[in-house]
């Protein structure tokens, strides 16, 4: 585990990391459990946040409270030498291996320090004993890279699917973490975690003045104009707010159209920092032209703003109207991965078809992106090339 950064005050309260009461896991399943697990895909929710924000506290809360949910939790960073880790991880011959334990509230728990995917593969052997998987990342991890693994897995017919990304932000130190400038000019870890989140939990709100929480909330909203922001104390949250989000599948299209209508454009909280931009273009899009637009942004990275800075897209989401398709199509993107999927929602005959996109990233220019979308989707490839040049590829 990487050492904690900052003062002792930024670390988790040791009392909050007391080991939950454990019972040995049974190796056999009842007939009902086996039936309930057959054919059903299991949602994976990624829990991320800066060091000391409250990730372990949230997971301990889920593992100990009576909530009638059967949740499997994978602890990827549980604090060096903590009582929780000692109970969940067994060292033998100098190698750490996983030990799944069943808690009295029906949850499963495991500590793993290398590969969360391997832990999930082992966990799936117990399919039928749980309904959801929560995966904790390390404090400095890029949740986009973790999310991409499960998104790709789902495309390969896996038994799991990515449900959403939850980012926890410390009320006391969050603003400091989000405004920290890295010497190499890269996006700092805390900001990237917020930018990728579907749900942002502002934690420990009881430890700071209300005015500080408002400032932090404003900064978070300036980074991510799409995610839902919730305020919590000691990471206590209604599980319905963090589970069954369907943030990465077609079911989210049912509610996405209404949400996209209220997404505000944001201004950067630091020069060249992350912002949310949104635009709408009426009409139908040709699927191959839409792919060209997205691939130039995410893959080729050859789209620049007015200051000649490369536009870097971290998260992309939207609803589009594809020519000759009656269903609304949801477009999702994380880093260099993206997907188009038909939703259960049909376009009504008496309503105008439209395309509405939300992009979260750095150096984004709404006007240029909207013009490029119109040119790419509705005009010829020759006209598109007037907006970028091959020798301007960003590095």
From Swiss-Prot:
Limits of the CobW C-terminal domain: 274-377
EC numbers on record: 3.6.5.-
Family note: Belongs to the SIMIBI class G3E GTPase family. ZNG1 subfamily.
A GO molecular-function annotation: GTP binding
Chain positions covered by the region annotation Disordered: 1-22
Biased composition (Acidic residues): 8-20
Residues binding GTP: 49-56, 110-114, 203-206
Reactions accelerated catalytically: GTP + H2O = GDP + phosphate + H(+)
Pfam families, per database record: cobW (PF02492), CobW_C (PF07683)
Residue span of motif psi-PxLVp motif: 17-24
Keyword vocabulary terms for this entry: Chaperone, GTP-binding, Hydrolase, Metal-binding, Nucleotide-binding, Nucleus, Zinc
Residues spanned by motif CXCC motif: 107-110
Residues annotated to bind Zn(2+): 107, 109-110
Gene: ZNG1C
Compartments where found: Nucleus
Enzyme class: hydrolase
Protein name (Swiss-Prot/TrEMBL): Zinc-regulated GTPase metalloprotein activator 1C
A cellular-component GO term for this protein: nucleus
Chain's role: Zinc chaperone that directly transfers zinc cofactor to target metalloproteins, thereby activating them. Catalyzes zinc insertion into the active site of methionine aminopeptidase METAP1, which function to cleave the initiator methionine from polypeptides during or after protein translation. Mechanistically, the N-terminal psi-PxLVp motif binds to the C6H2-type zinc finger of inactive form of METAP1.
Keyword Nucleotide-binding found: yes
């Amino acid at each position: 585990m990487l050492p904690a950064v900052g003062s002792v005050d930024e670390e988790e309260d040791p009392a909050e990391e007391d080991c939950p009461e454990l019972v040995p896991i049974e190796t056999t399943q009842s007939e009902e459990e086996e039936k309930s697990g057959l054919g059903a895909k299991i949602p994976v929710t990624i829990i991320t946040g800066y060091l000391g924000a409250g990730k372990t506290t949230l997971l301990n809360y889920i593992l100990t409270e009576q909530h009638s949910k059967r949740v499997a939790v994978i602890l990827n960073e549980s604090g060096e030498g903590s009582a929780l880790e000692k109970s969940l991880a067994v060292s033998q011959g100098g190698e750490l291996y996983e030990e799944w334990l069943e808690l009295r509230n029906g949850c499963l728990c495991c500590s793993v320090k290398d590969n969360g995917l391997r832990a999930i593969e082992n966990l799936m052997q117990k399919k039928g004993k749980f309904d959801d998987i929560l995966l904790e990342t390390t404090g400095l991890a890029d949740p986009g890279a973790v999310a991409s693994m499960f998104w790709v897995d789902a495309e390969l017919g896996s038994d799991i699917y990515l449900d959403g990304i939850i980012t926890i932000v410390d009320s006391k130190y969050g603003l400091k973490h989000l405004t920290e400038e890295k010497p190499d000019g890269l996006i700092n870890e805390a900001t990237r975690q917020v930018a990728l989140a579907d749900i942002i939990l502002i934690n420990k709100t009881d430890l700071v003045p209300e005015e500080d929480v408002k400032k932090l909330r404003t900064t978070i909203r300036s980074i991510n104009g799409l995610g839902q922001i919730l305020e919590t104390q000691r990471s206590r949250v209604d599980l319905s707010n963090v589970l069954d989000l369907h943030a990465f599948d077609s079911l989210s299209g049912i509610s996405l159209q209404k949400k996209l209508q209220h997404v505000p454009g944001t201004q950067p909280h630091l020069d060249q920092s992350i912002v949310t931009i949104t635009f709408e273009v009426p009409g139908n899009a040709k699927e191959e032209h839409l792919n060209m637009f997205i691939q130039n942004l995410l893959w080729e990275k050859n789209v620049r703003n007015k200051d000649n800075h490369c536009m870097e897209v971290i998260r992309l989401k939207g609803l589009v109207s594809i020519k000759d398709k009656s269903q609304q199509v949801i477009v999702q993107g994380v880093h260099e991965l993206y997907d188009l999927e038909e939703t259960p929602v049909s376009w009504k005959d008496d309503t105008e078809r439209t395309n509405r996109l939300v992009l979260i990233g750095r150096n984004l220019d709404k006007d240029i992106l909207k013009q490029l979308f119109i040119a790419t989707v509705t005009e010829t490839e020759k006209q598109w090339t007037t907006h970028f040049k091959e020798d301007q590829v960003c590095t």
